[in-house]
Structures are given as C-alpha cells and as structure tokens.
UniProtKB/Swiss-Prot annotation:
This is CASP-like protein UU2. It is a multi-pass membrane protein. Residues 55-72, 140-156 are extracellular. Belongs to the Casparian strip membrane proteins (CASP) family. The keyword Cell membrane applies. It is found in: Cell membrane. The lineage of its organism: Eukaryota, Viridiplantae, Streptophyta, Embryophyta, Tracheophyta. It comes from Selaginella moellendorffii (Spikemoss).
Amino acid sequence: MEESQQQSSKFDAPPSPYVPSRVYLAQIYWKKPAIVVLRVLQFIFSLIAFSVMADVLHDVQGSIKSLSYTVAIGVLACAYALAQLSFSLWCVIRGATSSAGVTPLYQYATFICDQMSTYFLISAASATATLIDVSGVCGSNGSGTNLCSRSTASVTFAFLAFLAFSASSVLTGYYLVKCILKA
C-alpha cells in the first residue's frame, strides 16, 4: 500500500518549469529533422554539382573562368553543408531544442552563412548557364554535346542545392527571430 502511494506521489507533482513540456518538445522536434533533411539535400546536390562541373572543367583544361568559379562555390557550399549537417545531427542526437544549447551568435552566423551560400550558388549557376548558352560551345554542329549535357546537369544540381539552401535559410531565419524575441 505504501508503495502505491509513493508511485502516485511521483506522478502527482506539478511539472517543473525548467524541463520543457512534451507538447513544446513535439512542436520543436519536427523542425529539427526538417533542417537535417535540408542539410542532407544541400550536401548531396552541391556535391553532385561541383563534382560534375569539376569533370567538365578538367575536359576544357581549366580555360573557362566561370566553370572554375562554379567548382569553387560548389566546394565551399558542400563543405559548409557538411559542417552544418554534422552540427544539426549532433543537436538532434543530443536532444537540444532550437533554443537550448544554441547561442544567439550561432543563430546569426548560421543565418548569414546560409544567405551567403544561397546567393553564391545562384550566382555560380547563372554564370555557368549563361556561358553554356552564349559561348557557342554547344553549337548546332553537334560538337560538345556531352560537355553541354554535363554542364547542364551540373547547373541543374546547383539550382537544386540553391533551393535547399534557401529553404534552410527560411528555417534558420525563423530560429533567429524566435531567439531574438525570447531575449
């Protein structure tokens, strides 16, 4: 009988103000897997984009500067996405919410880096797309069609990486505003 009273007293205690409620955690945790999925997509798309473009750049012996720019931006975007993916996975595994364990400085830095990566990716993709269209490499005589199709595939994946970066930028902007409003 005493044992049942002890068990019921454990469950009758009011919730602690220091421990987030289950409802709050359920509202936050759906966003963490979303950001992890976006980071995975960023990494995969930017990896494919820069590896295909590096192959194209090797074929033209590095003579076209916008292809070099696209490869460089792809490498930077891929490295940034991998670093953010690692940190996001660490936060999800650790069980941190968007406000616990993440400093406001990190929120600012993530938002700024996401924005910069987004703009750099669309800049690199548009520079390469313009080059493919204007340079005459993809002429009507059929020469360079393999080069053109690979370049087009790389631009497509760079654009998909841009979409993933912009979606994660929206989420990190949400986290930043939420962090600012709590302060």
